[in-house]
């Protein structure tokens, strides 16, 4: 049997918005190995830093892999569409210019609501008056607000950063009403943004001067993991990392990593970049050892310290805690955005999601995820905000399930899974008359009668962008695969075989959360072609794998819009809407 699995190497642009600004970040795809068994599975095994091995059942439930970015989106206008009162208004506003400010740098960031024209080249009033009247009417104002208005926050705008709405784009806004609570209300609020290009020489500013808002980083959809670039240290060094909702530590590969080819090892560390702490004037080594092991066999060990992390010019975290890895078999670092309980050191520290609030980049330790469709070039993670244009129906909030009375994993109850098969084209290999799966187990031909489905009994399930595939218990996976015929385990692929036609367009799985939210995922996300049988027929395996922990990875997450609130301990989900629109509202 010959197994073949090819993944394309793609590149795209990542976005960032902090406070009132938007920044574009370049990102690049990773190339995976062959077969489902070789996809990264970076579930931490235990904490080896302090010699204490926590039980796998207590200290696991995630796999690592997603990402971050860096770069700048330059723009000279505000562009967008605002919906309200049953209709929408498209707007594009060129920023006023002045002889006092020439060149491409645009207006500088400021915390002053009244912008100084001598410094920025235009005033706030100039900017507000440039926006069409229809926009202000939509949000309930008769005219543009001015710097002398001291009333409501219906339009508290500050021309302090970059914004845009065309793909790939992002925007930051201030809501006309209090931002959505952790329950992630689906009602939209008014929005606006300003446009500029940050200076190339921007340095991290103090937290007192930072504007609280929402920012997002666009992520490349590789179907294996997501990568982007961070700027680390002073002067900044660009290093690519993976972003993961299921882990909590940030670590970079050191230039001195013994496994790098340049140091006599076998790993091409230049591919994604390394961090040379000796070249950073702001690096501080706190003399704490760091070590972690993953289920895919990778290990990482090094030293914890602090330095400045820049998501885009002018938008940074000062003295961010992270590890510099001197010995690892991985070719790329990790950016975890989970609970501090998952940190691989005994003395817990303020990881980046919490540092973002601490340094006033966001008002709440919360972020939302939109990975877009399987074939999309990019998705994004939005820190401190919700993009109401990216889902359909209502966001439903679910309490995060604790582990041993602690908030450790970003997991919610999964009640059941059912299948809808509407396309039997090229169905083969089953006895005559048996192409249709078992009665009582699936939805037939698009009808809404489940007649059962697979009961998962509210299994606590991790929502993890760091996992390529998904995992359920062996019995649960076999029950789902059994919907499509005989259950056969493929030892080489470490997965269950499934008829390839199951992945035809129009077929889907429906995931039921507490009988309150139902997420439809195309079966094509779970049907993986890995080669051929001896007969020459195509061989496919199922992308929900047997495991000791329940995880919904990238092949599920592409179909859901998810808001992770690590303060109120809830995750809100809705069916993802694939479009180019944005309606960003900060979470307050």
UniProtKB/Swiss-Prot annotation:
In its UniProt record, a GO molecular function of this protein is: aspartic-type endopeptidase activity
The listed outcome for residue 244 to A is: Abolishes catalytic activity
Quote the biased-composition stretches of kind Polar residues, using this chain's numbering. Answer: 160-175
Give the originating organism. Candida albicans (strain SC5314 / ATCC MYA-2876)
Give the Pfam families listed for this entry. Asp
Spell out the catalytic residues: 244, 464
Q: Which residues are part of the propeptide segment?
A: 17-143
Broad enzyme group = hydrolase
For this UniProt record, the keywords arranged alphabetically read as follows:
Aspartyl protease, Cleavage on pair of basic residues, Disulfide bond, Glycoprotein, Hydrolase, Protease, Secreted, Signal, Virulence, Zymogen
Processing after translation: N-glycosylated.
Known outcome of mutating residue 242 to A: Abolishes pepstatin A insensitivity
Name the UniProt record assigns to this protein: Secreted aspartic protease 7
Disulfide linkage: 260-269, 500-540
Single GO biological process annotation from the record:
proteolysis
């Amino acid at each position: 049997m010959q197994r073949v699995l090819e993944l394309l190497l793609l590149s795209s642009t990542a976005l960032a918005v902090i406070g009132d600004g938007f920044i574009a970040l370049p990102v690049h795809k990773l190339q995976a190995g062959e077969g489902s068994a070789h996809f990264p599975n970076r579930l931490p095994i235990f904490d080896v830093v302090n010699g204490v091995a926590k039980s796998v059942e207590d200290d696991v439930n995630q796999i690592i892999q997603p990402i971050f970015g860096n770069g700048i989106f330059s723009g000279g206008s505000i562009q967008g569409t605002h919906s309200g009162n049953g209709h929408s208004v498209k707007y594009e506003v060129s920023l006023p210019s002045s002889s006092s400010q020439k060149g491409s740098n645009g207006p500088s960031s400021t915390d002053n609501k009244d912008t100084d024209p001598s410094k920025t080249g235009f005033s706030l009033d100039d900017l507000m008056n440039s926006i069409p009247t229809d926009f202000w009417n939509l949000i309930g104002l008769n005219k543009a607000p001015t710097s002398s208005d001291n009333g409501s926050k219906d339009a508290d705008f500050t021309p302090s950063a970059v914004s845009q709405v065309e793909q790939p784009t992002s925007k930051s806004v201030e809501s006309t009403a209090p931002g959505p609570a952790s329950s992630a209300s689906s009602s939209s609020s008014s929005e606006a943004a300003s446009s500029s290009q940050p200076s190339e020489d921007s340095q991290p500013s103090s937290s007192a001067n930072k504007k609280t808002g929402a920012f997002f980083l666009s992520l490349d959809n590789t179907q294996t993991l997501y990568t982007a670039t961070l700027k680390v240290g002073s002067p900044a060094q660009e290093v690519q990392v993976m972003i993961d909702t299921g882990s909590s530590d940030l670590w970079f590969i050191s230039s001195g990593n013994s496994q790098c080819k340049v140091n006599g090892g076998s790993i091409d560390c230049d591919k994604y970049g390394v961090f040379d702490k000796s070249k950073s004037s702001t690096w501080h080594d706190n003399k704490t050892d760091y070590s972690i092991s993953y289920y895919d066999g990778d290990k990482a060990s090094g030293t914890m310290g602090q330095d400045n992390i820049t998501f885009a010019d002018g938008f940074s975290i000062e003295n961010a805690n992270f590890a510099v890895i001197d010995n690892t078999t991985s070719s790329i670092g990790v950016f975890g955005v989970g609970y501090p309980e998952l940190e691989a050191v005994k003395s817990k520290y303020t990881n980046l999601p919490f540092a973002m609030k601490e340094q006033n980049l966001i008002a709440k330790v919360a972020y939302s995820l939109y990975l877009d469709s399987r074939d999309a070039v990019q998705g994004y993670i939005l820190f401190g905000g919700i993009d109401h244009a990216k889902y359909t129906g209502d966001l439903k909030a679910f309490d995060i399930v604790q582990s041993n009375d602690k908030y450790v994993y970003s997991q919610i109850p999964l009640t059941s899974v059912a299948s809808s098969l509407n396309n039997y084209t090229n169905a083969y290999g089953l006895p005559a008359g048996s192409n249709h799966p078992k009665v009582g187990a699936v939805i037939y031909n698009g009808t809404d009668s489940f007649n059962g489905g697979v009961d998962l009994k509210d299994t606590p399930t991790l929502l993890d962008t760091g996992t390529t595939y998904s995992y359920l218990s062996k019995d649960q996976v076999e029950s789902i695969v059994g919907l499509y015929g005989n259950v056969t385990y493929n030892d080489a692929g470490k997965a269950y075989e499934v008829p390839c036609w199951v992945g035809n367009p129009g077929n889907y799985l429906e995931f039921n959360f507490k009988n309150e939210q139902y997420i439809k995922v195309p079966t094509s996300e779970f049907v993986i072609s890995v080669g051929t049988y001896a007969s020459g027929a195509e061989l496919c395996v199922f992308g929900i794998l047997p495991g000791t922990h329940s995880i919904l990875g990238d092949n599920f997450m592409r179909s859901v819009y998810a808001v992770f609130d690590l303060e109120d301990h809830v995750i809100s989900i809705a069916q993802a809407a694939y479009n180019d629109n944005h309606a960003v509202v900060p979470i307050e």
